[in-house]
Regions:
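Hydrophobic "anchor" residues on beta-strands that sit immediately upstream
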Residues: 27, 126, 270-273, 381, ...
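Switch/communication elements of ASCE P-loop NTPase nucleotide-binding domains
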Residues: 1-48, 218-371, 570-571
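Short glycine-/polar-rich loops that comprise or flank the Walker A/P-loop
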Residues: 61-68, 89-92, 121-126, 267, ...
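Glycine-rich phosphate-binding loops of NTPases
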Residues: 54-57, 74-168, 358
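Acidic, Mg2+-coordinating catalytic modules of nucleic-acid enzymes
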Residues: 1, 49, 71, 85, ...
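Conserved P-loop NTP-binding catalytic core
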Residues: 38-87
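Extended helical coiled-coil dimerization/tether regions that scaffold
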Residues: 138-275
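Conserved catalytic network of the ASCE P-loop NTPase/AAA+ motor domain
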Residues: 58-62, 119-122, 245-247, 261-265, ...
Length: 575
């Protein structure tokens, strides 16, 4: 069972929004305070048949109305009795309504209007892991919640399988210790007057549960680092919440399961995680998300063994929903993203799975996703063609006294002119404004749009050299060479080495005589610009870009780059 889509009316700050969910994993992204966590609270309320609070109503005069569409497997048909779509028995649309003065909500079949018992919604099995939970409570073994509940159940299984008499401690010594302890406690007046005494646990389970504590082999778990505690809590939480379903008396556990075509008993669940990046470094963030995906798809044999031992089931069929502000937690591609953004003080939502992008662009986008993840959190994106520009633009912005981070401006290296357009289409589809900077060799007489900028020369490297030369700053051109390679001026540049740059500039390499940069006269405009441009082009990369960015003053920055950065600033400030 998976959530296919949801429509929200009159709920907090996500009123009037709809979204389509990916059947496997979803990442809710966007700026703070736009309703991502509110969406998880909404699912928790609806999927567990809870009542809305007064604060949940956007307009107290109108009801909250949630339309939830579920996709069922053929083996799950009947989970909600005869309630399913008349057009497709594997889907069911639910309407969940409540007025502010009503004590409980109403749930009906969207297509037929038939009433559905609220308790039936618990079969959706929505599990919400909250990273604000305290490890000191959740990882204690001596309680009947969290880890304690799970450990207690495992001990029960062990005790059930012991054929002989279940004696774990020396009864005589325990009795002597109890008498000794109470003899001293009885000297306290209140203990004596009210018969308060130390009492041995009635059952082996109760006694054994208090015998253990979690540790890393050296220290108690509560003395380990926060990251260790939170990763332990995050991974054990799923089992603990399934244990709550298993022990619940409201619905028989067997009624929560379906049997697949191979005869295996499967529990469908929807798992949500709010900000898994809390206390976890990037590798652990990715590891945790991949672990969740593995257990929800039955790809972790150890976890399957635990499910079999604890609950008598063979696996899970799960859907993952993650709220995150971390690019490291985005394990997937753009189709897994659900972006929250604001227009005119209202939250809007775009689902990546609902986008219709051209097939020829999709391969580019899927391959580039790891490099462009930051862009989905941005207010504006600057798209550039190559690594040299990528290395210099942050420094250019700083030189112009423009803070990219404060404004939420992301710089993305498209890796070539041919990829800028597909990336721009993707960003447009997610309502993310972008500014594109192209090399002049692709302009071909085209009139620039307001969000497009072109170098005057064939490429960035030539633009920098000629711009500096035109302003009488040949010493800066040479300084950049010296910063990148202290011997760069004194190496003979052979024809084969300069062949490609010369071809790009339309220079006949056959007329070239090998020489050093130091042999080039500053008074020879053509030779100086051609030789240094060719050297820059051969050395292009992030390091060259950073050196250029750090050396140039505001007046020395080529105008197309300064103008593009200022345009991005304007756009970001008005989003």
């Amino acid at each position: 069972m998976k959530i296919k889509s949801i429509n929200v009316m009159n709920y907090r700050n996500i009123d009037g929004n709809s979204m389509i969910l990916h059947p496997e994993s979803n990442y809710l992204i966007g700026e703070n305070n736009l309703g991502k966590s509110n969406f998880l609270f909404l699912l928790d309320t609806v999927c567990n048949g809870k009542t809305f609070d007064e604060k949940d109503f956007t307009n107290p005069e109108a009801p909250i109305e949630i339309t939830l569409e579920l996709q069922l497997l053929p083996n799950e048909i009947g989970f909600f009795g005869d309630n399913f779509s008349p057009h497709d028995p594997t889907t069911i649309k639910l309407r969940y309504l409540q007025k502010i003065d009503e004590s409980c909500p109403t749930c009906i079949n969207y297509d037929t209007g038939e009433s559905i018992q609220i308790r039936q919604l618990k079969k959706i099995h929505y599990i919400k892991y909250d990273t604000n939970a305290l490890p000191s409570r959740e990882l204690r073994v001596d309680t009947q919640r969290g880890t304690g509940l799970l450990v207690s159940s495992i001990i029960d299984k062990y005790i059930e399988n012991i054929p002989e008499e279940k004696t774990f401690l020396n009864s005589e010594q325990i009795e002597n210790l109890t008498n000794y302890l109470n003899e001293h406690l009885n000297k306290i007046r209140s203990f004596k007057e009210y018969s308060i005494m130390a009492t041995v646990a009635d059952t082996p389970n109760e006694m054994l549960s208090r015998l253990y504590y979690l540790s890393d082999g050296v220290r108690k778990i509560d003395c380990t680092g926060s990251g260790v505690q939170f990763i332990a809590m995050a991974t054990i939480n799923v089992l603990c919440q399934i244990m709550n379903i298993y022990k619940s008396k409201s619905i028989v556990f067997e009624d929560h399961l379906y049997t697949d075509d191979n005869g295996k008993k499967i529990l469908p669940i929807i798992l949500s995680v709010d900000e898994p990046e809390v206390h976890l470094h990037p590798f652990l963030q990715r590891s945790l998300i991949r672990y969740y995906k593995q257990i929800l798809q039955n790809k972790d044999n150890d976890f399957i063994e635990l499910l079999k031992m604890c609950f008598g089931i063979d696996g899970l069929n799960g859907q993952l929903i993650v709220v995150t502000h971390s690019t490291d937690a985005l394990v997937g591609d753009y189709r897994n993203l659900i972006r929250f953004y604001k227009t005119e003080e209202k939250t809007n939502i775009i689902s990546g799975i609902s986008l219709n992008l051209r097939d020829e662009n999709e391969k580019h986008l899927l391959m580039h996703f790891p490099e462009i993840k930051e862009a989905f959190y941005a207010k504006c994106v600057i798209l550039i063609e190559g690594q040299t520009e990528y290395g210099c633009i942050p420094s250019f912005a700083e030189t112009l006294n423009i803070s990219l981070d404060d404004l939420g401006i992301s710089v993305i290296n498209a890796g070539g002119e041919g990829t800028i357009k597909p990336l721009k289409c993707l960003l447009d589809a997610f309502a993310i404004p972008s500014i594109s900077i192209y090399d002049g060799d692709v302009k071909n007489g085209k009139t620039s749009a307001t969000d497009e900028f072109f170098t005057n020369e064939l490429c960035f490297e030539i633009e920098v050299v000629k711009h500096l030369y035109a302003n009488g700053q040949t010493s800066i051109v040479k300084q950049i060479v010296q910063e990148l390679d202290s011997k760069g001026e004194n190496v003979v540049l052979e024809a084969n080495y300069l062949k490609k740059p010369f071809e790009k500039m339309g220079i006949n390499i056959a007329t070239y005589t090998p020489k050093k940069l130091s042999d080039v006269s500053e008074s020879d405009t053509a030779e100086f610009c051609n030789m240094y441009s060719a050297w820059y082009m051969k050395k292009k990369g992030i390091l060259l870009g950073r050196i250029i960015g750090q050396i140039l003053t505001p007046e020395q920055i080529p105008s197309c780059y300064a103008d593009a950065i200022k345009k991005a600033q304007e756009v970001a400030q008005n989003v």
